[in-house]
């Protein structure tokens, strides 16, 4: 979730800003911009009066879009986004790296690791040593995102409705992600979301509002993780990407960044979310003018399911071979490990279930130039958290 500060960086007892979506405490990142009708920010006494200690750091009240007083209206929207890295350091090539290593050793009073003949061979492209641009192997220049929105709303004499559907597809910056048959090691996120807001006049004095939101999100990443540290830690001269006999290559000190990113399989996270709340507004003017009551029942359920498809891969360690003059004339390769099939494991990573009931009785009356507004509020909630357990 984004970090939001209403009253500065500090917070009282670490509570943070209280976010209410249609009167229910929920995460603001569960919302799409197109489904927001209004946002109200409360702070200081305004938030304390209504929400007590929980509102000491401010309250953000978000109201989702409701059905309008009109016939059926349909909207369709499509967004295409191109993302590019803000800045990526330019990495040294093999010649620059070899010269830098020699200079560092010289400053410590040690002998050079690479001879002038080795460096000249690197410049000429005749050296057996590698000159791999790991940044180019791992990253591509841009990522492409797609978003499709569909909504329709309207009303009749007794009901107002609003339906919003959203599909999002995001692909990451990794390169060479289709090296394996049957699966990709790209960072990908796909999400499908549906929201329905209904409001009905049950009687002349009773209004019912029901809000439903469901979302399915699938996130995929390489089993080796998404860290870019291997790009910066592995020098271009360490080893070729592949060994001459096939399979990945590396040396004794440094790993093969592309093997970590593309060779170990993938993992997927499936998140399912359901938000539901029902609110009844009752006008009690028949009892006494200015009296009203409100009752809200809420049920939220979110779960994370983690699927992992991992495998081991064979690799060959490259070792320089020196000629009689001490120059690097070749690379020898020693093979380790074996290529294995994808394994499979699936588990419920976590699940959160939350029920909440909220009631309010309100009385308003004008006395000449004075206005009286009194409210009594009752709330009770229950939150249940399930930890990880295997589903097989």
Which functions belong to the PLM regions below?
Residues 166-191, 221-227, 241-243, 271-273, ...:
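Small-side-chain secondary-structure face that scaffolds active or pore-lining regions
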